[in-house]
Amino acid sequence: VQMPGCYICRPVIKGEYLLFAVIVTKDWGTYDGMLAVLNKNNKVVSFPGGSAPSYVDKTLIKPKYDQISFRNPHDVCIDDDWNLYVPQWNSGKTYPVKLTRI
């Protein structure tokens, strides 16, 4: 699966989805990152912490960080209610972020 500009961490499979943290999109000093959610066809359906997924001729366009949500997300864990837990690397000792499903 081609993920332009995305340095990814450990993938997690939940149901028909594949999720992973995008630890950085530029360089290690920019402290950015987001999550990626792919469907069963390996198409990105969401970039929490980033721009909406966009394709041109079936090729994913490099996503843009939203400048606020994460700081080098290093992993993603999912509970039975589909809440997401996101630890962050080199983030100034922040606690993991919990994203509650709505």
Where on the chain are the PLM-derived regions?
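Eukaryotic scaffold repeat domains enriched in small/polar residues
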Residues: 1-102
